[in-house]
Amino acid sequence: MFVAAMTESDQNIINLLFSGHYADPFAVLGMHDTASGLEVRALLPDAIDVWVVDAHSGRKVANLQCRDPRGFFASAIPRRKKPFSYRLAVTWPQDTQVIDDPYRFGTLLQELDIWLLAEGRHLRPFETLGAHPSTLDGVVGTCFAVWAPNAQRVSVVGDFNFWDGRRHPMRRRRENGVWELFVPGVGPGQLYKFEIIDCYGNVLVKSDPYAFESQMRPDTASVVSRLPPALPVDEARQHANELQSPISIYEVHLGSWRRHTHNNFWLSYRELADQLVPYVKEMGFTHVELMPVHKHPFDGSWGYQPLGLYAPTRRFGSPDDFRYLVSAFHEAGINVLLDWVSGHFPADSYGLARFDGPALYEYADPKEGYHQDWNTLIYNFDRHEVRNYLAGNALYWTERFGVDGLRVDAVASMIYRDYSRRDGEWVPNYFGGKENLEAIGFLRYTNQMLGQHHAGAVTIAEESTDYAGVTLPPEHGGLGFHYKWNMGWMHDSLAYMQLDPVHRKYHHDLLTFGMLYAYSENFVLPLSHDEVVHGKRSLLDRMPGDVWQKFANLRAYYGFMWAYPGKKLLFMGGEFAQGREWNHDTSLDWHLLDEPEGWHAGVQQLVRDLNHCYRQHPPLYQCDYLHQGFEWVVVDDRENSVFAFIRRDADGNEMLIISNFTPVPRDSYRVGINQPGAWREVLNTDSWHYHGGNLGNQGLVYSETVGSHSRPQSLVLALPPLATLYLVKEA
């Protein structure tokens, strides 16, 4: 192979190209109009011979000279004055190929995209950044783009170039630090990463933050995949998310809901569509909440330490398979909520951590950027590009996968700089306060953006403090969420239920206190996965007493919860009273439903009936967030641990709910009512259908003109032990 002579200046540039320290490869490679005419230059390590081929005629027009034995070729093109489309005929040691030169194509990102990305206001950054199979000038390939403003050089590497960072260095867009390159011949299914020489000279190999598909762990490469098309917004699904609609959520961890019995392996997305969807529908839940399905390296994080926010985990199948699962839920009339982790990410070397050398996606100061509880890094909400990455992801899941809402994880850790930190371990905000003003601004923007551009999608905050206005609109000083988990109600009610009934009269306020703040936010009542792990025990195991009392307590509690103001959430396994804590490595204990005693099957039947009763009776849901929707009747019967209240819909229709939280039956318990006449017992958690004792009122109960509880009319009821009753006024 003949090597042509080079000037010292030319050789320096070539050396920089091969060492990976030349930041503008397009200034050297490709076709250039020089003083001596058109010239083509190519960087092709291991090539033996290179010809320029006219792309239209297919004729060879020039043999490129080898200017460096490492694989740099260049020559003037004789008798050509105007730039033209060309290809390269390359002879390798094993064969000859005709390839398209990535460096003959112009810039990829439009000026408006560049500006919007820099400002953090690009509505759909995922349409611009990442890997996008495309056709340019009739050439099929993939457009790659990645934000790495501190990098000295970025190359795209993959199967298509032997993972060799010398072969495809990218163009730097100095306006905003994005690197871009169109690589001909690369298509869906091919693996890739970005090789980055950071500002310190270190070579890093990173997965694509915007990858739509990734390899199954422990492999870490991104996969070229087409952007899923946008899905239409369904009016019925929008209505199902509204404040005045019934919302009963089944929280699911896809990897442990059910597994293959012969090898304990996960069900796929499509198998879940066949098994989980009909089960949720039969059980009467209106919504399903999927614990995070983003790419995450560690099974034990349950998805809450994601490293690929735009890629559904490959544990259960492809992105198309996940879309199939979401569609199956929708066809069954079930809305899909997705747990969304926008506060922190793990520090795995191939991920976002120190992406191009210094802290980029995370805060640089560990007092701001390191989460001690979870050993993770905290997103730098002060950077426009980081906020854009996250906000765009929220729209991506709702718009491209049809997800109906996002449950935002660990909001308190985002909005407070001193979250889980002692004095001296956190950095105050600009005004000296503890609030993370940038994170608050991000949440407000994201909630507003979703409301404007994906009507009907809801956001739910897991916020564990008393921060005011979580569900108020941003224009009124709030964060803009639609709903907030009621952690206070959950803690108080479980604390009450764990007490031996003989002691409950001394803690009566645990069940009444919640109504003092029930209308301060739009609350969801959560019995989530967090309540059945880390030694807290299962819900059933937390109930006091013998077997009969444990199940009766749990049934009475569920009855109370389903009637209490607020939307409902129950973690999988709770619907049939799983006896042990949740284990993400195994299936739920479905065999319990086959036990001859029938305790677990009884609870499952109760939850099914509670859901259907809840959906059929507007007083139980229509005015959850209006004072008119709830009225205490019996609030102070500490001695008997009895609670009674009215639920009311917008038309004034009423339901009476009464709970007896002692194991003592109350045979003639008088309860005041507003509306005289016949009242029908429509649900009794002590029914034999639920494996209870079947004490109750056997259908209709007629009012008496006897005053009680400051009301002129009353009912005399038989209250079963450890039970909740629902009664409806007959028309």
From Swiss-Prot:
| Protein EC | 2.4.1.18
Q: Which ranges form a coiled coil?
A: none
Give the first-level EC class, as a single word.
Answer: transferase
- Keyword entries, A-Z: Carbohydrate metabolism, Glycogen biosynthesis, Glycogen metabolism, Glycosyltransferase, Transferase
What is this protein's record name? 1,4-alpha-glucan branching enzyme GlgB
NCBIfam families of this UniProt entry? branching_enzym, PRK05402.1, PRK12313.1
User: What is the pH-activity profile?
Assistant: Optimum pH is 7.
Membership in a protein family: Belongs to the glycosyl hydrolase 13 family. GlgB subfamily.
Q: Cross-referenced InterPro entries, in alphabetical order?
A: A-amylase/branching_C, Branching_enzy, GlgB, GlgB_N, GlgB_N_E_set_prok, Glyco_hydro_13_cat_dom, Glyco_hydro_13_N, Glyco_hydro_b
* Reaction catalysed by this enzyme: Transfers a segment of a (1->4)-alpha-D-glucan chain to a primary hydroxy group in a similar glucan chain
Give each disulfide bond as a residue pair: none
Question: What is the top-level taxon of the source organism?
Answer: Bacteria
PANTHER family the UniProt entry points to: 1,4-ALPHA-GLUCAN-BRANCHING ENZYME (PTHR43651:SF3)
Q: Name one GO cellular component term.
A: cytosol
GO molecular function term, any single one: cation binding
Kindly tell me the pathway this chain contributes to: Glycan biosynthesis; glycogen biosynthesis
